Amino acid sequence: MAADKAGEQGAEKHEDSANCSGISDHEKELSRSALQAFTAGNYEACLQHLGELKEINKDDYKVILNSAVAEFYKSDQTTTDLLKQTLNQLRNEVHSAIDEIDSLDDVENSMLYYNQAVILYYLRQHMEAISIGEKLYQFIEPFKEKFAHAVCFLLVDLYLLTFQTEKALHLLVVLEKMILQGHSNNKNGKNNETNSNANNREPFAQRGDGGVHVEAAKSKIHQYKVRAYIQMKSLKACKREIKSVMNTSGNSAPSLFLKSNFEYLRGNYRKAVKLLNSSNIAEYPGFMKTGECVRCMFWNNLGCIHFAMGKHNLGLFYFKKALQENDNTCAQLPSSNTDPGKKFSSRPMCTLLTNKRYELLYNCGIQLLHIGRPLAAFEYLIEAVQVYHSNPRLWLRLAECCIAANKGTSEQETKGLPSKKGIVQSIVGQGYHRKIVLASQSVQNLLYNDGESSAIPVASMEFAAICLRNALLLLPEDQFDAKQENGSKTSSQTGNTDSGGESSEVCSNKSHEGDKFIPAPPSSPLKRQEVENLRCSVLACSAYVGLALGDNLMALNHAEKLLQQPRLSGSLKFLGHLYAAEALISLDRISDAITHLNPENVTDVSLGVSSNEQEQGSDKGENEPMESVGKQMPQCYPSSVTSARTMMLFNLGSAYCLRSEYDKARKCLHQAASMIHPKEIPPEAILLAVYLELQNGNTQLALQIIKRNQLLPSIRMMSDLRKKPLFQTMHQPMQPIQMPAFTAVQRK
């Protein structure tokens, strides 16, 4: 772990300074003894030697630094706040800010900055840690080999956590050359070891087992490369490195987890599950030593695999198991100190990274949304958004929960109208006074506010509007100006449903393209194409919510913005025209609405954008394991261009009715009915036919349409009715039936 390196290097620092002129032999001996005691784990003796050194030279901040590190290890790494405070005080004595590290003179203070970077790493302040690490990397040449490796490994880990995979791969290449070159120099320099003074023999003695150190470093490099390639989805390069990992690490839990992730990306889900089950997680060190709950990762990864397989209920089961394991693990940790100055103390520093509750809540919420339990999903996601409030995709998911929770009778909408029960609410009276009461279809357009503030997080349409507004604000105005902001708190070990990887040769050619993304923790950052797709989805949902709330101007604004997007999928273009038409009809702009309802506007209803640009780093074009893979067609969605054009014609007929152009409306109705199966005709179309016949004075024909639950009676029935007078003359003026907006039953 990085903390171990921090302590070892911190204890070595003063020992190295003993070579400086003006230092007595007694100080050198004390320095050497302190290092030996620290390496042996005898922190009491180490502190005693450092105390004697401090009495000799009270102004040497390096002794204070080493004492702070030794005290930290003596407390089993539980005094994180005290160590952080000491390092900040020492830094203020040396420099007022990290930005002042601009010369080789700062090499003397490198150990102080490195220890600060390690603490920031465990506090999940990744960007601050990277800032320090990159400053140290500028002066890495004078550093000792082991310390230089520690700086590089820390930077690589930080780059991967912040999804800067290209920088990580470049640094791994440099690190690999550094290790091979250092190993070669050690072999050539063995003859000079006996001529070194006692102060220099100790570092050489530590590198006496250089072969073991080099092999361990190589194994770690291979694992980091696999993680980078997985992030960039470079499966060919990842396959090569996986072989190296298995050769160097064997069937250890980390190597099997990485190989399982690789098979998961390839779509070999059964093999990925088999690899996970073959890992012996019981032999892996406990979370108190590593800060990682392997059981939690195991269940989470199983949940992700079953999510990709479309087995959402089983995936939810595994995610809940992971959440339970995470809660049990956190319960074993000492309770946090109530003192604000000691909130990170009382437990090992590595355990500050143990809690993955909010990542798991996010996964559970997405899984529940796919299952069709929006209210339960809302409860999980509303808790996750308190931490990941900068994720626009998460705000969209919350809005989708609200929309789905307030959706109408989706079963009836999906299956069409199985019986007249769908349009007939009740029958009152008998004989001459017998009346048919038609069901109202306009309840969906009622406001949902019951007097509560719309800012209260409940699954209402008002709150959905707020969520969508937040999502739009978090997206960059110009998709080509998306900045590289990597301050995400994601963990590459938990296997979230979004992931990414590619070789250094390939990524170097695509660096400019890959740098354009915005963070979306706990998922992968959003790339340019993903930002465009997300904006289209948010605009479509915003138009739908605006219509549901009766805010027609806002709905029209969002629908028009949606239709102006340069890369718009056929499905969202279809919805954009429908939503714009409904808003225009509500605003009494029928002519403009008819323009949007032209069936020729629909040429494609695919969920994706046909593009020559493939996912960056994808070698084959495997399906990306995200929650938006679109493996199943959403309910209530037109399955073909024909059904979409039919929906357009039904709506166009309604628009013509509003202008009293009943012949055109009847023509649209007949044309639409001839394009689909009678069972697929929506109940609103039946009502439209009834309305047209009533306007034409054909009361009995309208009754027959309701009775037979068919859009048009048989030809024989129509000819018979033409010969007979109408059954009853209406004594009251005809009241037009309020036609529902067909787009209200559409859902993305």
Swiss-Prot record:
Compositional bias ranges of the Low complexity kind: 185-200
Chain segments carrying region Disordered: 1-25, 184-205, 483-524, 605-635
CC annotations in GO: CCR4-NOT complex; cytoplasm; nucleus
Bias-annotated ranges (Basic and acidic residues): 1-17
SUPFAM superfamilies found in the cross-reference section: TPR-like (SSF48452)
Protein location: Cytoplasm; Nucleus
Chief place of localization: cytoplasm
Record's keyword terms, sorted: Cytoplasm, Nucleus, RNA-mediated gene silencing, Transcription, Transcription regulation, Translation regulation
Subunit structure: Component of the CCR4-NOT complex. cnot10 and cnot11 form a subcomplex docked to the cnot1 scaffold.
Family: Belongs to the CNOT10 family.
Function (record text): Component of the CCR4-NOT complex which is one of the major cellular mRNA deadenylases and is linked to various cellular processes including bulk mRNA degradation, miRNA-mediated repression, translational repression during translational initiation and general transcription regulation. Additional complex functions may be a consequence of its influence on mRNA expression. Is not required for association of CNOT7 to the CCR4-NOT complex.
PANTHER family recorded: CCR4-NOT TRANSCRIPTION COMPLEX SUBUNIT 10
UniProt-recorded name of the protein: CCR4-NOT transcription complex subunit 10-A
